[in-house]
């Protein structure tokens, strides 16, 4: 892995990340393909939209279809016919989401498979083994996602466990030529975030992610922790904000020096008939669009906006036609990729602050 910073505008950074399967221009947004597919879209469509890297999920791919299937194809890239870089989450957040169905110990996490009820045991070593089979360009350490809200002692215990798991992840990753990213935890406590960063830095990683945000905390709390944490991450390594977020969240995070993002919002909201546009969010189920013959966004040149009207998309949403979800997803991911392109251009021109002010209205 090679990360090169080209320029910056205050804290906002413009760079290039070179990985085994290609190059990524940063700041970058990664569409989420949890099960090895971005819902409803083909790899060719994703490339046409401008996506350079996508995210897969270790936990879900391990359970279904299973490693033997992916290994038979020679890795996740061939299995899903995507020849660009792939980042895989370690499974820590998904285990956290199981709630009472899982039992955490020093060794790892024991839980019942949500697929068939089998007892499963996921450890840092097993997560690294799975991601090696997947041949992920960016491997994430196995960590515990600190819940919200929790008191400081619980958050500290969780952060310390994640640091011990980070050491084990690093040791188990040895011999894998792909990149390994550490994940900063510590809940809503700045001092714990500081100690997490110091511990991860001492272990040494190819990049650093901020985890444990967008887990139910108020927006102002997320911004407080982000603005405290991001500037402390190593300058010469890529910085990844996990699971965030809205277009506004992304612009604010770029202001803090974040380079990489992922979020399910553009595709999930597309399936629910919410489109991101230059004029704000358009909610297609609203009856006001039944006779609206204008495109979803007058300022967008995506396939959906060039060929279809709001009235047609309203009709598809109301009737539950799967084409509606596809067309909406094409538009929303195009919107996100164009946003990242505009952000990169603004940083290059030294105009990012002005861009951010215009964007926030």
Swiss-Prot record:
Listed EC numbers: 2.4.2.29
**How is the cofactor bound, as the UniProt entry phrases it?**
Binds 1 zinc ion per subunit.
Provide the catalytic activity annotation. 7-aminomethyl-7-carbaguanine + guanosine(34) in tRNA = 7-aminomethyl-7-carbaguanosine(34) in tRNA + guanine
Residues noted as binding Zn(2+) in the record, renumbered to the chain: 300, 302, 305, 331
Q: Oxidoreductase: present as a keyword of the record?
A: no
Q: Does the keyword Repeat apply?
A: no
**Which protein is depicted?**
Queuine tRNA-ribosyltransferase
Q: Which organism is it from?
A: Nitrosomonas eutropha (strain DSM 101675 / C91 / Nm57)
Taxonomic classification? Bacteria, Pseudomonadati, Pseudomonadota, Betaproteobacteria, Nitrosomonadales
Which gene is this protein's source? tgt
